[in-house]
């Protein structure tokens, strides 16, 4: 799915020739990864989404007055290591690890997804943001804001609390990740030499997802 999105934090749509950012959504099933993605790209809240389905989406935005083309992989909510998971761990340039503030287990599982990234990339210096979703369900909160902030500080990454249902802070989370990627790109020894190889891995992964969808129809 490809949608051009005029994001709220940086008005205006991106022009041609935008830098492409390969983003991977991680987190336990049911935390709202797909709802966040759909709200970001199309300002729509899905009535239903199968948490076992992995899919890819594309959108263009402007972030800090620079065009950005986001290629977003919305993953299934299992923290097991698989061959396909290894592909998107290698191909992704940045990761959004999501949990639900109403589900303490999903918060605890965030560490498993962080470790999966390390198993493949062998470094913790990967662009990453931590997101606590479903803050519209405050009466059911099990994870405090302070706990989320503390974990983000441990990971040395950005932290956002969001509501996909209300489209609260959704743009901020995606924009924050792109800023982290751009920050890493300013250090060529860490990022620049790896971009071509990641692009090849990403294309291979997208082809695998397409075949899976075709087999399901």
Swiss-Prot record:
Tissue specificity comment: Neuron-specific.
Keyword Cell membrane: yes
Keyword Repeat: no
EC number: 3.6.5.2
GO CC annotations on file: cell body; cytoplasm; cytosol; dendritic tree; Golgi apparatus; membrane raft; neuron projection; nucleoplasm
Gene Ontology biological process terms, A to Z: adenylate cyclase-activating G protein-coupled receptor signaling pathway; chemical synaptic transmission; intracellular signal transduction; maintenance of protein location in cell; negative regulation of neuron projection development; positive regulation of MAPK cascade; positive regulation of neuron projection development; positive regulation of transcription by RNA polymerase II
PROSITE patterns, alphabetized: RAS
Pfam families reported for this sequence: Ras
Any GO molecular function: calmodulin binding
Gene3D superfamilies: P-loop containing nucleotide triphosphate hydrolases
Keywords, comma-separated and alphabetical: Calmodulin-binding, Cell membrane, GTP-binding, Hydrolase, Membrane, Nucleotide-binding, Nucleus
Protein role: Binds and exchanges GTP and GDP. Binds and modulates the activation of POU4F1 as gene expression regulator.
Family note: Belongs to the small GTPase superfamily. Ras family.
Name listed for the protein in its UniProt record: GTP-binding protein Rit2
Organism this protein belongs to: Homo sapiens
Lineage of the organism: Eukaryota, Metazoa, Chordata, Craniata, Vertebrata
């Amino acid at each position: 799915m490809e949608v051009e999105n005029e994001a709220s934090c940086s008005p205006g749509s991106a022009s041609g020739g935008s830098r492409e950012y390969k983003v991977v959504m991680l987190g336990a099933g049911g935390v709202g990864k797909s709802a966040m993605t759909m709200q970001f790209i199309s300002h729509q809240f899905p009535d239903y989404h199968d948490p076992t389905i992995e899919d890819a989406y594309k959108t263009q935005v402007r972030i800090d007055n620079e065009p950005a083309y986001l290629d977003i992989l919305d993953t299934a909510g299992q923290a097991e290591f698989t061959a396909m998971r290894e592909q998107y761990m290698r191909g992704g340039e940045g990761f959004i690890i999501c949990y639900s503030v109403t589900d303490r287990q999903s918060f605890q599982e965030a560490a498993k997804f962080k470790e999966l990234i390390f198993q493949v990339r062998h470094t913790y210096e990967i662009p990453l943001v931590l997101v606590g979703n479903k803050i519209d369900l405050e009466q059911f909160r099990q994870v405090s804001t302070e706990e989320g902030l503390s974990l983000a500080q441990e990971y040395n990454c950005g932290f956002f609390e969001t509501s996909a249902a209300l489209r609260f802070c959704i743009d901020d989370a995606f924009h924050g990740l792109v800023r982290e990627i751009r920050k890493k790109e300013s250090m060529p020894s860490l990022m620049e030499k790896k971009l071509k190889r990641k692009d090849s891995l990403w294309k291979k992964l997208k082809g695998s997802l397409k075949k899976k969808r075709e087999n399901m129809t």
